[in-house]
Regions:
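C-terminal ends of transmembrane helices
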Residues: 13-17, 85-100, 149-160, 203-214, ...
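Hydrophobic core segments of alpha-helical transmembrane domains in multi-pass membrane transport
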Residues: 29-42, 82-88, 118-120, 201-207, ...
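Structural signature of hydrophobic alpha-helical transmembrane segments
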Residues: 72-83, 131-146, 187-200, 236-238, ...
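Hydrophobic transmembrane alpha-helices of secondary-active transporters
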Residues: 63, 67-96, 247, 328-349, ...
Length: 458
């Protein structure tokens, strides 16, 4: 049984393992997609690549139409689904996960704050005086969960599970900060009629939630209409995904049925009445780690011979949607985003490109600013007794985590695309993001490999 590996605050073991598996595999695919984009960008296929990205895609119903090129459909359309998934993860963590209490949220919140402030200050200091370049101040503030977990997966049991959880929590808070930054700082002029339509959609979503509608289809229909309204309003269309996630129903810890089942399950574990059909960690969210070979990983009900214990996820719309979106985001949407946004021309490239203030600001913000910010703010937080290091984690291992936080990629490239229309600036951003993310991943890997010891699961 692996019930003690997280300390007292246990996250859902089975769900967490599915998350790690998908995110890490998705991270590896993301790397492959980025490499392919760079290779295509510097091959005879470059013109075909640009033709595909800029091919017009028109959707028209009567007088209404959305006319965007394929690149914009990826960044405005598919990435709205990515933001929906990220927001669902944040909501789940806030309701009953690693961000559900002050004790749990303190460390990742403080670390993420440092990882936001210091990289941004480094970028601003290097680009002070250039008003156009300053628009990219938020680019080095993000962490890519998929890439970072992909690196951790290569280390296997050398990395404590509590360290993985902390990295995920920091990255989730980073994503939340990035969402707020996009909403506040990267919004163009607004159009009132679509905004009113968006407001009406939000009212309908609220009514669905208050009516305790657990079917997902009504939320998806209204969410699609909301996306159209947000797109037409001048706000960035990906914010629609964030708003929809706010209204997807989720059962919290206060549900009376859940409390009753908690009592039964704890009694079974304490008295040893389980029949061997299941073993694992049961916490206040009533999750079970299934180990029987005849049970697949998606099973949510286990018959112990005494009572039927049903996890809350079986009836939880939030979990169902999050679980359903993960594979599409990890294996389709993010690789497509990388293919469309990671291409960098190496023709005529020289060292001058790497010492441009924008490139340096992004690269040093991620490579130096992230670990410095995470380590400094964590040290201050621990000194002031606001937080403590994760269970079974030493400072040298935590430094490895801080280095991995410098892997920006997806969100950094996304913000870079919003900050700059000029292709020259975007090339500098890509150089900075890709160089720093690669260096952060390599340094983080070897730091954790040297400092880590094999974790024995019992």
């Amino acid at each position: 049984i692996q019930g003690s590996m997280f300390g007292e605050n246990v996250m859902p073991v089975r769900m967490l393992r599915e998350f790690f598996l998908l995110e890490s595999a998705g991270g590896i695919l993301l790397v492959i997609a980025a490499v392919i984009a760079i290779l295509i960008f510097n091959s005879p296929l470059e013109n075909y690549y640009h033709d595909i990205l800029h091919a017009p895609v028109l959707i028209q119903l009567g007088n209404f139409s959305i006319d965007k090129d394929f690149h914009h459909w990826i960044n405005d359309g598919l990435m709205a689904i990515f933001f929906l998934l990220v927001s669902l993860e944040i909501k789940r963590e806030v309701l009953d996960g690693q961000l559900s209490s002050r004790a749990q949220i303190s460390l990742p919140m403080i670390a993420a704050l440092g990882g936001l402030i210091v990289p941004s200050l480094i970028y601003i200091s290097l680009n002070w005086g250039n008003s156009t370049a300053l628009q990219g101040w938020a680019i080095p503030a993000a962490t890519d969960i998929a890439f970072a977990l992909g690196v951790l997966t290569l280390l296997g049991s050398r990395v404590p599970e509590s360290l993985k959880l902390t990295l995920v929590s920091i990255a989730i808070i980073d994503d939340l900060a990035a969402i707020l930054i996009i909403a506040v700082f990267y919004t163009e002029s607004l159009s009132m009629m679509p905004l009113l339509g968006a407001l009406l959609c939000i009212v309908v979503l609220f009514a669905l939630t208050k009516g305790k509608i657990s079917e997902l289809s009504p939320y998806m229909v209204v969410g699609t209409l909301l996306w159209v309204c947000v797109l037409k309003s001048g706000l960035h269309a990906t914010l629609a995904g964030v708003i929809v996630a706010m209204f997807i129903p989720a059962k919290g810890k206060g549900d009376p049925v859940v409390k009753e089942r908690i009592s039964e399950s704890v009694t079974l574990i304490e008295t040893g009445d389980n029949t061997g059909v299941f073993r694992g960690s049961i916490d206040d969210r009533l999750y079970v780690e299934l180990v029987d070979a005849d049970l697949n990983s998606s099973a949510t009900e286990v018959n112990t011979g005494e009572v039927n214990i049903t996890t809350r996820t079986e009836q939880d719309p939030l979990y169902r949607l999050e679980h359903g979106l993960h594979i599409w985001v990890a294996f389709l949407i993010l690789p497509l985003f990388a293919l469309a946004n990671a291409g960098v021309s190496l023709k005529g490239l020289n060292l001058d490109f790497f010492v441009e203030p924008v490139t340096l600001g992004v690269a040093l913000g991620l490579l130096l600013g992230k670990p410095i910010g995470v380590m400094l703010f964590t040290y201050i937080g621990i000194t002031l007794k606001f937080c403590s290091l994760p269970t079974n984690v030493e400072w040298k291992q935590y430094f490895g985590l801080a280095l991995l936080a410098g892997i920006g990629f997806t969100m950094s490239l996304f913000i870079g695309g919003l900050a700059f229309d000029d292709e020259g600036f975007q090339t500098l951003v890509r150089l900075g993001v890709i160089t720093a993310s690669l260096a952060s991943g390599v340094l983080g890997y070897f730091t954790l490999r040297i400092s880590g010891t094999k974790q024995i699961n019992i």
